[in-house]
Regions:
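Alpha-helical membrane-protein topology signature
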Residues: 1-167
């Protein structure tokens, strides 16, 4: 029953993301997803994904608190530093396959969007990251993650299309 709840909690956040019509709501929803998916990945012992999600939650928190974008240089330094942390943990745990690197690719797309892009760019980065993380969830048979990320990609695509029409 507990495992079912861990899989359902992120899906509930993903469904709620269809009401994240502003950048702030999107970031708050992403923070909630980080907590929910992080808990699920720890339970599933998918440590690479869990580390990625933890660092992602910190990045999302920074953007919510500061409410400003980083300069290009600061963005790249931050991304590289975070990527090194995640890849180091993967290496220490012996998780060095391409599948274990997929969360890092998602992480890079999400963090670039959060730290450097305004709403439209942020949504594009989240669409790309969510599609990749959906594939990771399917490959690792973490179904709550796969469904969540597919829904999150769909909601971001919906709002991105609305933004493009408004421009």
């Amino acid at each position: 029953m507990f495992e079912l709840l861990l899989h359902a909690f992120p899906v509930a956040f993903a469904l709620a993301s269809f009401w994240s019509n502003t950048e702030r709501k999107l970031l708050l929803m992403n923070l909630g997803l980080c907590i929910a998916i992080g808990s699920l990945l720890v339970f599933e012992q998918a440590w690479g994904g869990a580390v990625v999600i933890t660092v992602a939650g910190l990045s999302t928190s920074y953007r919510l608190i500061k409410q400003k974008l980083l300069s290009p240089v600061a963005t790249y330094i931050t991304l590289i530093s975070m990527m090194v942390i995640v890849l180091t943990v993967n290496n220490l745990t012996g998780k060095t396959s391409l599948v274990e690197a997929m969360p890092v690719l998602t992480f890079m797309a999400y963090r670039f969007g959060e730290l450097h892009c305004k709403e439209a760019g942020l949504r594009v980065c989240m669409i790309i990251g969510s599609i990749n993380f959906t594939a990771y969830g399917i490959i690792t048979q973490t179904w709550g993650l796969a469904i969540t990320e597919a829904l999150f990609a769909a909601s971001n695509l919906w709002y991105y299309m609305k933004l493009r029409r408004a421009m």
